[in-house]
UniProtKB/Swiss-Prot annotation:
GO cellular-component term (any): cytoplasm
Keyword annotations from UniProtKB, A to Z: Autocatalytic cleavage, Cytoplasm, Hydrolase, Protease, Proteasome, Threonine protease, Zymogen
EC number of the protein: 3.4.25.1
Matching InterPro entries: Ntn_hydrolases_N, Pept_T1A_Psome_bsu_arc, Pept_T1A_subB, Proteasome_sua/b, Proteasome_suB-type
Function description: Component of the proteasome core, a large protease complex with broad specificity involved in protein degradation.
Matches recorded under HAMAP family: Proteasome_B_A
Source organism of the structure: Desulfurococcus amylolyticus (strain DSM 18924 / JCM 16383 / VKM B-2413 / 1221n) (Desulfurococcus kamchatkensis)
Record protein name field: Proteasome subunit beta 1
One Gene Ontology term of the molecular function aspect: threonine-type endopeptidase activity
Length: 202
């Protein structure tokens, strides 16, 4: 069986101040563009966000489950779940479907009392903590752009600019990615969302 290419691209960058998540907005299936306004970054709590590449049905299911589990945790413990704990919970959920894996890769980024953290998970739940990550069909292009330009001393504004330029680079080359950029910046105060829409030409 050949390698499955998960459509779309999402990336994450960690700095000392927080985390930046970014994705493009194109939704494709079997060569067709189904939407030019798909949301691939979702906030689970006020301080944890997730970015996805893959099938939108699996993405929406996981977002609902994670939000429910995070809310239950907050009600039981009186505080938000930690980023690492949410990533481990997602790992268990994905692994439980290992015989029929969900067709999605996930970036988890957040800020808690331990500071900023960033994780990448594959379809069967392998979880790795990283300083910068990319998932989906444009992952290699994104990492090729980010790697020589990233350093841990970046400020959030610089990381935001790097993330946007990385996604733009992917969109220029990857037909499964396109149409705009969703951006989320997470720090100790919460999160800010931004959207960049590309105008159609021709």
């Amino acid at each position: 069986m050949g390698e499955v290419v998960l459509p779309g691209t999402a990336i994450g960058l960690k700095t000392s101040e927080g985390v930046v998540l970014a994705s493009e907005k194109r939704l494709t299936y079997d060569g067709f563009v189904l939407s030019r306004n798909a949301r691939k970054i979702h906030m689970i709590t006020n301080h944890i966000g997730v970015g996805f590449a893959g099938l939108m049905g699996d993405v929406n299911f996981l977002v609902k489950v994670l939000r429910l589990e995070a809310k239950n945790y907050e009600l039981q413990h009186g505080r938000e779940i930690k980023t690492r704990s949410l990533a481990k919970l997602l790992s268990v959920i994905l692994y439980s479907y290992k015989l029929a894996p969900m067709l999605t890769e996930v970036v988890v980024g957040g800020y808690d009392e331990e500071g900023p953290s960033l994780y990448i998970l594959d379809p069967v739940g392998s979880v790795i903590e990283e300083k910068y990550v990319a998932v989906g069909s444009g992952a290699q292009l994104a990492l090729g752009y980010i790697e020589p330009r990233y350093n841990p001393g970046l400020g959030l504004k610089e990381a935001e600019e790097l993330a946007v330029n990385a996604v733009k680079t992917v969109i220029e080359r990857d037909v499964l990615s396109g149409d705009g950029i969703d951006l989320v910046v997470i720090d100790k105060n919460g999160y800010q969302s931004k959207e960049i829409i590309f105008k159609m030409t021709g």
